[in-house]
Amino acid sequence: IGITGTNGKTTTSILIHNMLNTLGKKTAYIGTNGFYIGKFIKELPNTTPEIIDIYELLIEAKKEGCEYVCLEASSHGLDQNRLKGLKFDFAVFTNLTHEHLGYHKTMENYAKAKQKLFNMLRNNKYAIINNDDNYKDYFIVKGNNNITYSFTKGDYYIKEYNITLSHSTFSVIHNNENYTFSTKMLGKHNIYNSLVSIIILNKIGYTFEEINKVLNTVE
């Protein structure tokens, strides 16, 4: 599971890691916060380490019996081919804002670097794209199984939401059906992050009821 975007990579990756582990699917995480398999194992020098280091971490995850790996794919890492040779079941685009332009120079270059992740999908696997972002078209790659998410219009979209001091509740429309979810994570940005986790777990095979139960408990 590869996740790219200016904001939301870490939160979304760790959320999916925590949810899958809670559901009994042993899952690793590689990213800004380090290397985890259910719990913290070690720090990493970069959000997306060098390719040889990534392969070592993947071998370790496999030895530990992991079924999934959540990986943060940074624009620097993608541009420098640190993920070369990897294939993904899920590629996620969260958003693109004006950062890292000292390195990429233009927003177009920045988007094209992140786009590389979407050319690394296995056949018939899933590209999950924020339909509310101005740069979404870079990530809707022909031949991919493209899924959009949104607060307005998409394959999965938020119809209503309510944020209190203790939790957020929101309803998701998918295939004209309405599903309600609740999370301890606060803020509209975390509803976006939660929606990505809902889509991925749904595509893995969990029901919306099963997903809501675990989303309610993890942070």
Model-derived features: where do they sit?
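Adenine nucleotide phosphate-binding catalytic loops in nucleotide-utilizing enzymes
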Residues: H104-A111, Q115, N144-E219
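Phosphate-binding loop of NTP-binding sites
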Residues: I1-N131, Y135-N144, H174-E177, L195-I204
